[in-house]
């Protein structure tokens, strides 16, 4: 039996075309591409602005059930579906997020897809790429430096150092940096205070970059950032410290979407990368809107399960950007359904139809949740070699009883040839006119009511609890004019509840909001639940231990 090639071996063997040829497929002139080598480029802001009057293509969201720690192949399916649509004669563009170094060297791996459904150059995309994350990290930390510098030179704004909310960021999983004391070492180093680091993908600057529509909107949003509070409890904004202009300068190039290609030489935008468990989990509005002007179909993803990424895609990204999705694909795997049915991780390779049927309740809820937004749904069964015919048949039967269709997809092994059936179904749904998109809640409800609606309607929680301090903070923000903002729930990706070990489709559980954060620049309020950390840690055996350069100088172990 021939050995199975690794993702990196497949990517390295790709017959890539020059990036100018990929741009030409979308009608992008050579002079409007800013090349980063031969196989990646940024699309100029000038070209993007010129597309404003064009008709939009169809928008397809790829989401998933609650995942296993390794993920269920959502990006792989997004890329595969884009290739599949092109294979059946549709002009399709893929839009995905950039990879964070934290997961690359941690547990989950990269974010370029897998098998024969990848975007390339895979190594570049998963590592430094075009420097967007560096720019975001730099802009965020410039503001942090200017806060402490302002205090050092007299604190004209009367910032209460006990109430500074702006932390520092870096693009790595490092639990040692979560909480620390800054400015130690004497008078010359400033005023000691408590601080810490978050991961770059949790930065409000990342969210702002992904929600801003142009450079002017970007600078306005950066100025709106609240960095902390004065002694009189009034908010201090980034523009009060005159930081917004310099931050925008650092982000000028990062605002331009990155164009790459799939293994089958189809265009893909890879831009922005907020996590979906601690941020809004979608690629940039700029990339998505540009792709909609250039392609007949745009296939995009939202992070983790539909309870997180899809809800935020609908309630934050689509609401803010005026997007209206035409269809949604929910990625399910036999192994994740079995895990949701109670099977232990080490036993997922063994057939267990009974556990799978039990775990299908998780899939059923995700289907119902997406339909709640008025978007038609198809289920993609991302095939693994350990799947049995009986297990696949059980999933198809369950989904058919919901009035939907589950389609087996082999894009990981076969590329676009393995996902044609799904591509045809997506076209059927998108062209049917069934989509009647609407957000889950209205702008005028109170912030706490919005949290309760997400918790009850999407998570099926029985109650939402929060300390008086949390409720008072929400009320204060409403009084300051932030009451119309949407909610961004920070929650475990492994369960509908706030307990990562509570699998399946739990009912009546309690959602406790332990902290709320106002992202005034991004335009949402973050409600933090459970044990979610905005700076992750590495696992006991991180994937970094297995990544190295071989004798030829090639990277091994990246996935």
Swiss-Prot record:
Family, per entry = Belongs to the formate--tetrahydrofolate ligase family.
**Top-tier EC class:** ligase
* Biological processes per GO annotation: tetrahydrofolate interconversion
Q: Tell me the protein's name.
A: Formate--tetrahydrofolate ligase
> Which parts of the chain span the membrane according to its record?
none
Organism in which the protein naturally occurs: Rhizobium johnstonii (strain DSM 114642 / LMG 32736 / 3841) (Rhizobium leguminosarum bv. viciae)
The protein's GO terms of the molecular function aspect are:
ATP binding; formate-tetrahydrofolate ligase activity
Disulfide-bonded cysteines: none
